[in-house]
């Protein structure tokens, strides 16, 4: 009988989980080399098989990742590459990682498989642990440039479209995005900003007044821009 895999990917979130399995932490940053660990917990009633495999990845302008084989300059050692996870059991995975070039990043995928459904489908869940190997180079405000920052009407709301570009070789993280109007402010989730990356930001604004400014909050500085009315040709 043919069996099919139903695979669920959970990426770059603050927590990766289903009601039965969790992995934590999901994201970890290190200076230079990594010497870390993560845990996988089986909250279900069925034993699970877990297979670990590291992958390199790139991220496009909209934040969507593309995965590939681990780049040869990244070296990863895992305490285990496969194991059985019993019901209610927590399993710790220890690892060491280094890279010939910094900054660099990779993801360790835990592919979790259990039983089959009544229709013969074998379910698999992929849980990510993402690792960033960073250097000591700090991003400064002059290395971040606004490409555009606009707002336009979108039904009963307004849509904000902005682009920001990292002109450096440093990795950084936008911790928070703030949009303000004459009488209000809204906060939005941040995102990682990779070396040389141009990042598209699309937000829905539901305030009563038109948005006027957008602000990106980094660890040690803020980057602001006025919001212009989008051209009707766009």
Positions of the model-derived regions?
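Beta-sheet-dominated interaction scaffolds and their linkers
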Residues: 20-45, 82, 140-157, 190
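Primarily extracytoplasmic ectodomains and periplasmic/lumenal surface modules that are beta-strand-rich
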Residues: 36, 42-49, 55-60, 101-102
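Asparagine-centered strand-capping/turn motif at beta-strand->loop junctions
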Residues: 40-44, 162-168
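Terminal connector regions
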Residues: 55, 98-143, 208-234
């Amino acid at each position: 009988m043919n069996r099919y895999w139903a695979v669920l990917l959970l990426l770059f979130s603050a927590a990766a989980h289903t009601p039965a399995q969790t992995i934590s932490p999901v994201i970890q940053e290190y200076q230079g080399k990594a010497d870390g660990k993560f845990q996988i917990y089986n909250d279900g009633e069925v034993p699970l098989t877990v297979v670990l495999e590291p992958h390199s990845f790139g991220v496009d302008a909209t934040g969507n990742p593309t995965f590939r084989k681990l780049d040869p300059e990244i070296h990863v050692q895992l305490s285990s590459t496969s194991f059985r996870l019993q019901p209610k059991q927590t399993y710790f995975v220890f690892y060491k990682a280094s890279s010939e070039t910094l900054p660099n990043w990779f993801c360790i995928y835990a592919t979790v498989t259990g039983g089959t459904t009544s229709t013969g489908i074998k379910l698999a869940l992929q849980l990510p642990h993402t690792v960033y190997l960073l250097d000591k180079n700090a991003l400064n405000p002059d290395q971040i440039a606004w490409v555009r920052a606009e707002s336009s009407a979108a039904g009963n709301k307004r849509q904000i479209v902005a682009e920001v570009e990292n002109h450096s070789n440093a990795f950084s993280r936008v911790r928070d995005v703030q949009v303000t109007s004459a009488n209000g402010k809204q906060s939005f989730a941040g995102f990682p900003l990779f070396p040389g990356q141009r990042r598209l930001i699309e937000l829905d604004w539901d305030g009563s007044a038109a948005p006027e400014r957008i602000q990106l909050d980094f660890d040690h500085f803020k980057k602001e821009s006025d919001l212009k009315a989008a051209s009707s040709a766009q």
